[in-house]
Amino acid sequence: MAGFERIVDERSTSGPDRSEAMVAYTKLNLSRSRRWLKQLNMLPELENGLPLVAPQNWLVLTEYWCGDAAQCCPVMAELARRTPGLTLRFVFRDEHLALMDHYLTEGGRGIPKLIAVDAATGTERFTWGPRPVAAQALVDTFRAVPVEQRDVEAMKEALHTWYFYDGCASVQQELLALCS
Protein backbone atom coordinates (compact mmCIF):
# COMPACT_ATOMS: atom_id res chain seq x y z
CA MET A 1 0.00 0.00 0.00
CA ALA A 2 2.91 2.34 0.62
CA GLY A 3 3.67 2.65 -3.09
CA PHE A 4 -0.01 3.20 -3.84
CA GLU A 5 -0.25 5.95 -1.20
CA ARG A 6 2.96 7.60 -2.38
CA ILE A 7 1.81 7.74 -6.00
CA VAL A 8 -1.51 9.32 -4.91
CA ASP A 9 0.36 11.86 -2.75
CA GLU A 10 2.45 12.72 -5.81
CA ARG A 11 -0.76 13.16 -7.85
CA SER A 12 0.42 10.55 -10.31
CA THR A 13 -0.45 7.02 -11.39
CA SER A 14 1.08 3.91 -12.91
CA GLY A 15 1.26 3.19 -16.62
CA PRO A 16 2.07 5.48 -19.53
CA ASP A 17 -1.18 7.50 -19.41
CA ARG A 18 -0.69 10.06 -16.62
CA SER A 19 -3.73 12.13 -17.53
CA GLU A 20 -5.85 13.85 -14.89
CA ALA A 21 -8.55 11.22 -15.39
CA MET A 22 -6.14 8.36 -14.68
CA VAL A 23 -4.75 10.18 -11.64
CA ALA A 24 -8.33 10.63 -10.38
CA TYR A 25 -9.06 6.91 -10.90
CA THR A 26 -5.91 6.09 -8.95
CA LYS A 27 -7.00 8.24 -6.02
CA LEU A 28 -10.48 6.70 -6.07
CA ASN A 29 -9.01 3.20 -6.22
CA LEU A 30 -6.79 3.82 -3.21
CA SER A 31 -9.94 4.71 -1.31
CA ARG A 32 -11.70 1.56 -2.56
CA SER A 33 -8.74 -0.64 -1.68
CA ARG A 34 -8.47 0.84 1.81
CA ARG A 35 -12.19 0.29 2.36
CA TRP A 36 -11.96 -3.38 1.40
CA LEU A 37 -8.86 -3.95 3.50
CA LYS A 38 -10.69 -2.43 6.47
CA GLN A 39 -14.08 -4.10 6.16
CA LEU A 40 -13.55 -7.24 4.10
CA ASN A 41 -15.65 -10.14 5.36
CA MET A 42 -13.89 -13.38 4.60
CA LEU A 43 -15.96 -16.47 3.89
CA PRO A 44 -16.02 -18.80 6.91
CA GLU A 45 -14.11 -21.48 4.99
CA LEU A 46 -11.31 -18.97 4.35
CA GLU A 47 -10.84 -17.73 7.92
CA ASN A 48 -7.57 -19.69 8.09
CA GLY A 49 -6.61 -19.12 4.48
CA LEU A 50 -6.75 -21.21 1.34
CA PRO A 51 -6.40 -25.01 1.37
CA LEU A 52 -3.23 -25.22 -0.71
CA VAL A 53 -2.01 -28.65 -1.81
CA ALA A 54 1.52 -27.22 -2.09
CA PRO A 55 3.09 -23.77 -1.58
CA GLN A 56 2.25 -21.31 -4.34
CA ASN A 57 3.59 -18.05 -5.68
CA TRP A 58 0.98 -15.64 -7.00
CA LEU A 59 1.97 -12.95 -9.48
CA VAL A 60 -0.68 -10.33 -10.22
CA LEU A 61 -0.45 -8.04 -13.24
CA THR A 62 -2.24 -4.81 -12.38
CA GLU A 63 -2.19 -1.00 -12.46
CA TYR A 64 -3.16 1.54 -9.80
CA TRP A 65 -5.82 3.15 -12.02
CA CYS A 66 -7.70 -0.12 -12.62
CA GLY A 67 -11.13 -0.21 -10.98
CA ASP A 68 -11.37 -4.01 -11.03
CA ALA A 69 -7.99 -4.24 -9.32
CA ALA A 70 -9.16 -1.98 -6.49
CA GLN A 71 -12.03 -4.40 -5.89
CA CYS A 72 -10.13 -7.70 -6.29
CA CYS A 73 -6.52 -7.19 -5.18
CA PRO A 74 -7.37 -6.55 -1.50
CA VAL A 75 -8.93 -10.04 -1.39
CA MET A 76 -5.75 -11.54 -2.83
CA ALA A 77 -3.65 -9.64 -0.29
CA GLU A 78 -5.79 -10.82 2.61
CA LEU A 79 -5.71 -14.42 1.38
CA ALA A 80 -1.92 -14.26 1.12
CA ARG A 81 -1.73 -12.88 4.66
CA ARG A 82 -3.87 -15.74 6.00
CA THR A 83 -2.46 -18.62 3.94
CA PRO A 84 0.77 -20.33 4.97
CA GLY A 85 2.81 -21.17 1.88
CA LEU A 86 1.30 -18.46 -0.32
CA THR A 87 3.46 -15.60 -1.52
CA LEU A 88 1.98 -12.69 -3.44
CA ARG A 89 3.62 -10.14 -5.70
CA PHE A 90 2.01 -7.33 -7.66
CA VAL A 91 3.66 -5.98 -10.82
CA PHE A 92 2.57 -3.34 -13.27
CA ARG A 93 1.04 -4.68 -16.46
CA ASP A 94 2.45 -1.93 -18.65
CA GLU A 95 5.99 -2.73 -17.47
CA HIS A 96 5.51 -6.43 -18.33
CA LEU A 97 3.62 -6.43 -21.62
CA ALA A 98 5.40 -9.51 -22.98
CA LEU A 99 4.17 -11.50 -19.99
CA MET A 100 0.71 -9.91 -20.14
CA ASP A 101 0.38 -10.88 -23.78
CA HIS A 102 0.54 -14.55 -22.75
CA TYR A 103 -2.53 -14.05 -20.54
CA LEU A 104 -4.99 -12.08 -22.64
CA THR A 105 -8.70 -12.11 -21.87
CA GLU A 106 -10.81 -12.22 -25.03
CA GLY A 107 -7.84 -10.72 -26.87
CA GLY A 108 -7.40 -7.83 -24.41
CA ARG A 109 -4.97 -7.00 -21.64
CA GLY A 110 -7.58 -7.20 -18.88
CA ILE A 111 -6.35 -6.71 -15.33
CA PRO A 112 -5.91 -7.70 -12.62
CA LYS A 113 -4.58 -11.01 -13.90
CA LEU A 114 -3.46 -13.54 -11.30
CA ILE A 115 -0.96 -16.20 -12.33
CA ALA A 116 -0.52 -18.93 -9.70
CA VAL A 117 2.50 -21.21 -9.87
CA ASP A 118 3.72 -24.10 -7.76
CA ALA A 119 6.51 -22.67 -5.59
CA ALA A 120 8.67 -25.81 -5.86
CA THR A 121 8.35 -26.63 -9.56
CA GLY A 122 7.39 -23.32 -11.17
CA THR A 123 4.52 -25.11 -12.91
CA GLU A 124 1.51 -22.93 -13.59
CA ARG A 125 -1.42 -24.09 -11.45
CA PHE A 126 -4.09 -21.66 -12.65
CA THR A 127 -4.86 -18.12 -13.76
CA TRP A 128 -7.70 -15.88 -12.67
CA GLY A 129 -9.01 -12.53 -13.75
CA PRO A 130 -9.60 -9.88 -14.66
CA ARG A 131 -12.84 -10.00 -12.66
CA PRO A 132 -15.33 -12.48 -11.20
CA VAL A 133 -17.55 -14.39 -13.65
CA ALA A 134 -20.71 -12.44 -12.74
CA ALA A 135 -18.92 -9.10 -13.12
CA GLN A 136 -17.53 -10.27 -16.47
CA ALA A 137 -21.11 -11.02 -17.58
CA LEU A 138 -22.01 -7.37 -16.86
CA VAL A 139 -19.05 -6.19 -18.91
CA ASP A 140 -19.90 -8.58 -21.75
CA THR A 141 -23.48 -7.28 -21.82
CA PHE A 142 -22.16 -3.72 -22.03
CA ARG A 143 -19.75 -4.63 -24.82
CA ALA A 144 -22.59 -6.21 -26.82
CA VAL A 145 -24.12 -2.74 -27.24
CA PRO A 146 -22.90 -0.83 -30.32
CA VAL A 147 -20.04 1.50 -29.37
CA GLU A 148 -21.94 4.66 -30.26
CA GLN A 149 -24.78 3.66 -27.90
CA ARG A 150 -22.67 2.69 -24.89
CA ASP A 151 -22.98 4.66 -21.67
CA VAL A 152 -19.54 4.12 -20.16
CA GLU A 153 -20.29 6.00 -16.94
CA ALA A 154 -23.47 3.99 -16.35
CA MET A 155 -21.50 0.79 -16.93
CA LYS A 156 -18.80 1.79 -14.45
CA GLU A 157 -21.46 2.65 -11.88
CA ALA A 158 -23.28 -0.66 -12.43
CA LEU A 159 -20.06 -2.65 -12.16
CA HIS A 160 -18.88 -0.98 -8.95
CA THR A 161 -22.37 -1.26 -7.47
CA TRP A 162 -22.22 -4.98 -8.24
CA TYR A 163 -18.84 -5.22 -6.46
CA PHE A 164 -20.25 -3.38 -3.44
CA TYR A 165 -23.23 -5.68 -3.04
CA ASP A 166 -21.15 -8.79 -3.76
CA GLY A 167 -18.81 -7.82 -0.92
CA CYS A 168 -15.88 -9.60 -2.58
CA ALA A 169 -17.60 -12.97 -2.00
CA SER A 170 -17.32 -13.97 -5.67
CA VAL A 171 -13.57 -13.36 -5.80
CA GLN A 172 -13.15 -15.46 -2.67
CA GLN A 173 -15.38 -18.28 -3.96
CA GLU A 174 -13.64 -18.42 -7.33
CA LEU A 175 -10.14 -18.44 -5.83
CA LEU A 176 -11.18 -21.07 -3.29
CA ALA A 177 -12.53 -23.28 -6.10
CA LEU A 178 -9.27 -22.91 -8.05
CA CYS A 179 -7.18 -23.87 -5.02
CA SER A 180 -9.33 -26.78 -3.85
Enumerate the predicted regions with their spans.
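Thiol-based oxidoreductase modules, predominantly thioredoxin-like and allied folds used
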Residues: 58-64, 76, 84-100, 117
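Non-globular targeting/processing and membrane-anchoring segments
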Residues: 1-56, 78, 82-85, 101-109, ...
